[in-house]
């Protein structure tokens, strides 16, 4: 589905150059759940921004569904982002002046979806995240877990192929964090590709694969079924997300 080849990212000021990413090579297959881990400042969010077409690499190639997006115009990148990608952020990024339904509806407005179709889709996705009873409430009236469920509803309403999640449980307690991770798992089971940046080993345990970054480089990749398999002769175990094991 997507391939990064020798991706580099440098941030320049008048006095210094800071290399955020160096020679990153990464492939994510359709339907995979990949967790990206590493210490603060290692380049995780920069990598996610490049994957999400919110930033461009200084060097290297990014192929998404067979297209070299690093060579696209900004307008073409925006169109591709709207059609294929959904975003979930640690800080929720809901608009305070809009209620739950209106926040969830926003991506469809930008896509020019007719009003009647928008309303039906909003109703369905809000029900999916168990927020129907809060549809007319504003973000300030919701708990952190409820706000993140609304953010996920907004991310998936356009049926994106890929969800990019940046510390989706970072502002939540363990109970609400589990609810959010279980919801991401449901989407993964339905075939959505998920790429998640996290500091939490608990959350990473939901993934099929963990990619570890250090100082802007990929230093290791771990297939979770391999990590759990003690006897190579045994059949591969069920991927962790399919078992919902992250907070057990």
Q: How should each PLM-predicted stretch be described?
A:
Residues 1-207:
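ABC family nucleotide-binding domain
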Residues 209, 217-242, 246-248:
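Conserved beta-strand-loop-alpha-helix hinge in the C-terminal portion
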